[in-house]
Amino acid sequence: LVGSEMCIRDRTAAAQAQRDTLTFNNDYYFSKRNVEELVPVTGQNIVMLGNSLTERGFWAEYFQGKRVLNRGIGGDCISGMINRVQPIVDGRPKAIFIMGGANDLLFSKISNEKLLQQYERLLDIIARGTPRTRVYIQSLLPLNEAHNEAFMKGKNARFAEFNALLRAMAERRGLTFIDIWSAMQRNGELPEEYTFDGIHLKAAGYAVWI
């Protein structure tokens, strides 16, 4: 998830010609990866892996003394996380909290089933490389579709369907599923007081998350 409401409007037209799957390879992605790797992950760390919803959170401040590293990159998708997870795995952190898939479902035509396969690949890399790391699967968050009905209409239904797949996958793998969706949603939508643009969170939204 990237930027402001203006950015979302700019991308609405592009949604008419969406790709089958999403990749995220631009200067911002690569510069963020480069800067993040200046601070290597260690066995004492808890890692927050995700997109802009994760990136915008002040996790180290929220959980002082827990050695939390923010590895969110705005705009990132599951394939992008696959491409950058190895340095995290190599550090064998205590725990990894994953929030991903929203950009894939918003900005590509990928099916829920194919996206789940990508998610499984991400988890396989983590499980093989650092089997003792605790992995937490966080649900997708609801949207406030009224902010951009032309672009977001019907997306909450897809998000809810994908969350059900994530929950089942977590149970099958013996991982913890964190249902943030249910804590935040009101009548299936992200409440206005939690969001600036229908996607990204205000402080009140992060207060619910943590």
What are these regions (language model features)?
Residues 46-48, 69-72, 95-100, 134-139, ...:
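Structural recognition of the beta-strand scaffold that forms the well-ordered cores
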Residues 1-8:
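Short, small-residue-biased leader/transition segments that mark boundaries at the very start
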Residues 26-42, 55, 87, 91-92, ...:
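Extracellular glycan-modifying ectodomains
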Residues 142-210:
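Catalytic His-Asp segment of secreted/periplasmic serine-dependent ester chemistry enzymes
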Residues 112-121, 156-162:
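Charged helix-capping and loop-helix junction motifs
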Residues 72-76, 97-108, 140, 185:
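Cell-envelope and extracellular/periplasmic
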Residues 9-95:
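Serine-esterase "nucleophile elbow" of acetyl-processing enzymes
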Residues 70-73, 102-115, 149-155:
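Surface-exposed cleft-lining segments at the edges of enzyme active sites
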